[in-house]
Amino acid sequence: MTISVAVSGASGYAGGEVLRILAGHPDVTIGAITAHSNAGSRLGELQPHLHGLASRILEDTTVENLSGHDVVFLALPHGASAEIAAQLPEGTVVIDAGADHRLEDPAAWEKFYGSAHAGTWPYGLPELPGQREALKGATRIAVPGCYPTSALLALTPGFAANLLEPDDVVIVSASGTSGAGKAAKVNLIGAEVMGSMSPYGVGGGHRHTPEIEQGLSNAAGERVTVSFTPTLAPMSRGILTTATAKVKAGTTAEQLRQAWADAYDDEPFVHLLPEGQWPGTKSVQGSNHAAMQLAFDPHTGRVVVTCVIDNLTKGTAGGAVQSMNIALGLPETAGLNLQGVAP
């Protein structure tokens, strides 16, 4: 079975990561590679690490260039994906790495993104309860945000097992600068980032907040309220999320650990580390893996979970390819046997 795939937004970090993974996928043939302002350029000028694809010329991101493929990956700014996706054939598997189709609540979309809601697609985080079934045979898939991927992996087992209170969830995430994209910004230049960390989107203002609340609320079966603070870290890629929540009365440390073990022991990409071993971002760099650890703080009655992912791989492109595999009935791990990089 050979699948023809087109990738849009190929000049950016997310699009480049999709291509890196697809280049090693045993069942994929890469067709159109498109961009907008960089159309006409050699891919190797913009993504010099993609040696096997370096001579490919970027085409313009149009419906005509993307049509005729089995699968289309859209790695575009929010708003752009919905416009193109609406014009692609229903039989084409369209995988949106942008935000356009993640949120279920139109009011939340309009509040945080300021435009009309384009609708909701199956959510491409297979490790969440029920999501594998939702993705099987899907022709439209919304790739989760990178912060929500780490946050939902961190806390979903506790809410799904009815062990956590819904009203006092605090999540702090540190991300590498690639999460902000390739566009030149003063706060992302080396002199500003090296040796420094800084928060942003503080006070509930980050666009991933409603997405995190949505996922945790679905797992809990009731409204979950989240305080989310993202932080820019002096590294190119990776996310370290520390998430805490109050545990329900009578919940023990053993029950907490068992809930996370039950959720992830059979997962190929999510790893609950042995007790006492805490994860670092370097261990998952360049891979589709997530590593986590948890502890119960009896002084505050809270569970503390730390989860690390690569924001570009498990947090975007790897999760997208994993979801594609499920949708098409391929082995879920196809093309994703990537280990972390050390040192």
Swiss-Prot record:
Q: Where in the cell is it found?
A: Cytoplasm
Q: Which GO terms describe its molecular function?
A: N-acetyl-gamma-glutamyl-phosphate reductase activity; NAD binding; NADP+ binding
Stated EC number for the protein is 1.2.1.38
Which is an annotated Pfam family here?
Semialdhyde_dhC_1
State the active site.
C146
Q: Which GO terms describe its biological process?
A: L-arginine biosynthetic process
Q: Which PROSITE patterns match?
A: ARGC
Question: Which pathway does it take part in?
Answer: Amino-acid biosynthesis; L-arginine biosynthesis; N(2)-acetyl-L-ornithine from L-glutamate: step 3/4
Q: Which SUPFAM superfamilies match?
A: Glyceraldehyde-3-phosphate dehydrogenase-like, C-terminal domain, NAD(P)-binding Rossmann-fold domains
Q: Which InterPro entries does the record associate with it?
A: AGPR_AS (IPR023013), AGPR_type-1 (IPR000706), NAD(P)-bd_dom_sf (IPR036291), NAGSA_dehydrogenase (IPR050085), Semialdehyde_DH_NAD-bd (IPR000534)
Q: Which domain of life is it from?
A: Bacteria
Q: Which reaction does it catalyse?
A: N-acetyl-L-glutamate 5-semialdehyde + phosphate + NADP(+) = N-acetyl-L-glutamyl 5-phosphate + NADPH + H(+)
Q: Does the keyword RNA-binding apply?
A: no
Q: What is its main location?
A: cytoplasm
What is this protein's function per UniProt?
A: Catalyzes the NADPH-dependent reduction of N-acetyl-5-glutamyl phosphate to yield N-acetyl-L-glutamate 5-semialdehyde.
Protein name stated in the entry: N-acetyl-gamma-glutamyl-phosphate reductase
Source organism per UniProt: Pseudarthrobacter chlorophenolicus (strain ATCC 700700 / DSM 12829 / CIP 107037 / JCM 12360 / KCTC 9906 / NCIMB 13794 / A6) (Arthrobacter chlorophenolicus)
